[in-house]
Amino acid sequence: MNSRDSAASEITPEVLLRAYACGIFPMAESADDPSLFWVEPELRGVIPLTGFRVSSRLARTVRSDAFTVTVNQAFTAVMDGCAEPQPGREDTWINRRIRELYSGLYALGHCHSVECWQDGDLVGGLYGVSLGRAFFGESMFHRARDASKVALVHLVARLIAGGFELLDTQYVTEHLKTFGAVEIPRRRYTGLLEKALTGPAANFTRLSIDQPISGTEALAIIAERH
């Protein structure tokens, strides 16, 4: 389902959360287009947390702690990075209204960022929405090789430790397939989402955000879930 909302200003962070609970998320045609439209894909991308894959080469990079990884320390800067052109992604769907809405969710504690730093510079990261025991990955970026991949590894470790059950990637790309992402039909996705939203919520900050874990610790957490 794609339905255009010409009055994007009527969407609030609270409305956005209710939409996520129904399996719907907003997008914009471009950064210059002020309108938003709702999306509910027939096939939904997910990464099963029990089947998250890390290549041997990436595992070596993660263990080396080549990047300093932080959480919720530079949310706005991560959104800025995600809005930059990337190889294979020259245009961005992150417009001003998207920035405002997700910044609002961040203020409410329902949006989080993972950052990768090198020599004091932000070189990669990702952000997404948490609701119940579901995490909805929104976007990622990198300015240094493997930075966004390392951020994803640390995110998955945090989700597992925090009791999350569903990692929604919205769509599946060739890049995400290398981590185990798969497409599932809408009906199956709806069932997984309903389960993840029933009962106690997960805790994104169960792992301290003041003392981030090492790459070796992150990989150990992921290995325990397999």
From Swiss-Prot:
The keyword Zinc does not apply. GO terms for biological process: protein catabolic process. Its main location: cytoplasm. Keywords: Acyltransferase, Cytoplasm, Transferase. One of its GO terms (molecular function) is leucyl-tRNA--protein transferase activity. GO terms for cellular component: cytoplasm. Its EC number is 2.3.2.6. It catalyses: N-terminal L-lysyl-[protein] + L-leucyl-tRNA(Leu) = N-terminal L-leucyl-L-lysyl-[protein] + tRNA(Leu) + H(+); N-terminal L-arginyl-[protein] + L-leucyl-tRNA(Leu) = N-terminal L-leucyl-L-arginyl-[protein] + tRNA(Leu) + H(+); L-phenylalanyl-tRNA(Phe) + an N-terminal L-alpha-aminoacyl-[protein] = an N-terminal L-phenylalanyl-L-alpha-aminoacyl-[protein] + tRNA(Phe). It holds the Pfam family Leu_Phe_trans. It comes from the Bacteria. It is found in: Cytoplasm. HAMAP family: Leu_Phe_trans (MF_00688). Belongs to the L/F-transferase family. Functions in the N-end rule pathway of protein degradation where it conjugates Leu, Phe and, less efficiently, Met from aminoacyl-tRNAs to the N-termini of proteins containing an N-terminal arginine or lysine. This is Leucyl/phenylalanyl-tRNA--protein transferase. It comes from Bradyrhizobium sp. (strain BTAi1 / ATCC BAA-1182). The gene is aat.
